């Protein structure tokens, strides 16, 4: 086995492990959600359409070219289009996680959200792991406009909410993207737990200090 083949096999196993962890801990249900990562050759490895994150076969993961061509494995999710848009427009993005996790999806369904940044920082980890979290308007799943909107937002952001749909998070590795996704989900949970209680938000100076 070549060095590249060994790296690819390791990444396949990592994807199935992380996906299974999401499923086992309740972040994903049924066949909802999808993950992807960039391979060293520039191709994309992604979870197949209709697949359960808790029961993936490393050898059946979808391999997709940078132009969207399906190369091998099972058929990719139609949502791979917006994964590709993120990779093309943010060179730091090496992996993408999209889930329908309970708290973040609930947050995406609320009216009156600030579309430029859904989560006003109230913990340091919001700033350190996510930064701003812009809201993409509702479109039917698979609609090309999701990819178009994410492409416009990708350069300056790494976490997003799709309205009435769920979260999308990037990372410089699949593990980092997974960690960022969990931080977003836990932050959304805190928002609902706090409810209408007065929140002590971070000041502009405190946010600047975290970003420095």
Question: What are the language-model segments listed below?
Answer:
Residues 1-212:
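Glycine-rich flexible loops
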């Amino acid at each position: 086995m070549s060095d590249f083949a060994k790296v690819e096999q390791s990444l396949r196993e990592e994807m199935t492990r992380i996906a299974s962890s999401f499923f086992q801990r309740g972040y994903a249900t049924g066949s909802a959600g999808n993950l992807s990562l960039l391979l060293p050759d520039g191709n994309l490895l992604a979870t197949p359409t209709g697949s359960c994150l808790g029961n993936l076969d490393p050898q059946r993961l979808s391999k997709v070219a940078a132009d969207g061509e399906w190369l091998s494995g099972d058929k990719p999710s139609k949502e791979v289009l917006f994964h590709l848009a993120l990779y093309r427009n943010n060179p730091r993005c090496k992996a993408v996680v999209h889930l329908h996790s309970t708290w973040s999806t609930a947050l995406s369904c609320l009216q009156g959200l600030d579309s430029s940044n859904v989560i006003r920082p109230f913990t340091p980890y919001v700033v350190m792991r996510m930064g701003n979290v812009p809201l993409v308007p509702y479109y039917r799943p698979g609609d090309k406009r999701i990819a178009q909107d994410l492409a416009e937002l990708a350069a300056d952001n790494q976490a997003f909410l799709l309205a009435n749909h769920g979260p999308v998070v990037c990372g410089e590795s699949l593990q980092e993207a997974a960690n960022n996704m969990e931080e977003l989900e836990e932050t959304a949970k805190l928002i609902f737990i706090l409810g209408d209680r007065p929140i002590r938000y971070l000041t502009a100076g405190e946010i600047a200090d975290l970003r420095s």
